[in-house]
């Protein structure tokens, strides 16, 4: 008759609560970053910081494009197949 909990049921419950995988130093180091996941703070938060990084990345891409297009000339930076082959 199944009228009570057995030790196997208790152990399976405790096994389900344990985290799967291996505990690594990197995982332990990154755990505080994941503890805030799912929480939304009121206000703009880090939106301004994200905007600054997007603008800096756009400037970086623009500089790379100008170097490739030879619009921005730098000393010792040439874009020809002959110099790449040697």
Swiss-Prot record:
<protein>
    <recommendedName>
        <fullName>Photosystem II reaction center protein H</fullName>
    </recommendedName>
</protein>
<keyword id="KW-0602">Photosynthesis</keyword>
<dbReference type="GO" id="GO:0042301">
    <property type="term" value="F:phosphate ion binding"/>
</dbReference>
<dbReference type="GO" id="GO:0009523">
    <property type="term" value="C:photosystem II"/>
</dbReference>
<keyword id="KW-0812">Transmembrane</keyword>
<dbReference type="GO" id="GO:0015979">
    <property type="term" value="P:photosynthesis"/>
</dbReference>
<keyword id="KW-0604">Photosystem II</keyword>
<dbReference type="InterPro" id="IPR036863">
    <property type="entry name" value="PSII_PsbH_sf"/>
</dbReference>
<keyword id="KW-0150">Chloroplast</keyword>
<comment type="similarity">
    <text>Belongs to the PsbH family.</text>
</comment>
<keyword id="KW-0597">Phosphoprotein</keyword>
<dbReference type="InterPro" id="IPR001056">
    <property type="entry name" value="PSII_PsbH"/>
</dbReference>
<feature type="transmembrane region" description="Helical">
    <location>
        <begin position="48"/>
        <end position="68"/>
    </location>
</feature>
<keyword id="KW-0934">Plastid</keyword>
<keyword id="KW-0472">Membrane</keyword>
<keyword id="KW-1133">Transmembrane helix</keyword>
<keyword id="KW-0793">Thylakoid</keyword>
<dbReference type="GO" id="GO:0009535">
    <property type="term" value="C:chloroplast thylakoid membrane"/>
</dbReference>
<comment type="function">
    <text>One of the components of the core complex of photosystem II (PSII), required for its stability and/or assembly. PSII is a light-driven water:plastoquinone oxidoreductase that uses light energy to abstract electrons from H(2)O, generating O(2) and a proton gradient subsequently used for ATP formation. It consists of a core antenna complex that captures photons, and an electron transfer chain that converts photonic excitation into a charge separation.</text>
</comment>
<dbReference type="GO" id="GO:0050821">
    <property type="term" value="P:protein stabilization"/>
</dbReference>
<dbReference type="Pfam" id="PF00737">
    <property type="entry name" value="PsbH"/>
</dbReference>
<comment type="subunit">
    <text>PSII is composed of 1 copy each of membrane proteins PsbA, PsbB, PsbC, PsbD, PsbE, PsbF, PsbH, PsbI, PsbJ, PsbK, PsbL, PsbM, PsbT, PsbX, PsbY, PsbZ, Psb30/Ycf12, at least 3 peripheral proteins of the oxygen-evolving complex and a large number of cofactors. It forms dimeric complexes.</text>
</comment>
<feature type="modified residue" description="Phosphothreonine">
    <location>
        <position position="3"/>
    </location>
</feature>
């Amino acid at each position: 008759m199944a009228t009570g909990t057995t030790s196997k049921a208790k152990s399976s419950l405790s096994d389900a609560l344990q985290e799967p995988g291996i505990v690594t130093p990197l995982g332990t180091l990154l755990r505080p970053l994941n503890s805030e996941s799912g929480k939304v703070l009121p206000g703009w938060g880090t939106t301004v910081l994200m905007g600054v990084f997007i603008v800096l990345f756009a400037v970086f891409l623009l500089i790379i494009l100008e170097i490739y297009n030879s619009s921005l000339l730098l000393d010792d930076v040439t874009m020809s197949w002959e110099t790449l082959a040697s």
